[in-house]
C-alpha cells in the first residue's frame, strides 16, 4: 500500500514539474498554492519544489470561524518549501475571511500580517481585492470569502502608511538567508497535512523550524561542523524524526551517514522499513 500511495504522490508532483517546464518555455514563472490547506495524496513539499513562488494562506482574526492560530495560519508548508528549495520569495493568500464584512481596518489586520511575516511569509496577496466597475453601487460586487480591500473601502485614501509598511517588510524579508533552528522530517509526506497547521508551541518557545522531506534528505543534506546544511546556505542544529515505526531504507542509510558525520538526530528509533527496497 505504501508503494501505491508513493506512486500517486510522485505522479501529482510530476504534474507540477511539467507545468513549470511548460511555463518556463514561454518565459513564465509558476506560483502554486500547492500546499492545500485541504488534504491530498501527495508530498506537498515536493509539489512546491516545482513552484517558482510557493504559496500558503492565512486568515484574518475572527470570533466565529478559524479561531485558533493552527486554523488560521496555513503557511508552514510554503515557508518550508521555500527554505529547503532555495526560493527567496514565499507568498500567501492573505487576510482570508468569511466575516465580519467591511469592518476590518489596518489596526485590526496588522497583528495578523506581523505573525505571517514571523512565520516566514514575505509576499502578500490580498484576499481579496474586488475589481468592481465604477458604475456599480458601492461597495461593489465581492467574493464572499475575503477581507475586502479596494478603492471603495472607507479608509482607502488613508492607507498609504499601511501599504508602505507592508511593502517595506516584504522587501527586507526577501533579502538574505533565513535562520532556522530545527528541521522536522515528515516521512513520506502523504496524508500528513495535520502537521502543517502551525505548531505554535515551537515558535512560542522561540524556535524556528522547517519541515523537510525524503527528497531533500537524500539529495541535498550534508553535515558541516555538526550542523545539517543545505546548498543554499541554510543550516539546522538538529533533525527531528517523525513519530512513526517505519522509514524507508534509503532515508535510514542517509540518516546513519549524517550521524557518523556529526549530525544530531532526535526522535524514536525506527523498527522497520517501508515499501519495497530499490
Where would I find each of the regions flagged by the language model?
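Carbohydrate-binding surfaces of carbohydrate-active enzymes
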Residues: 1-54, 59-278
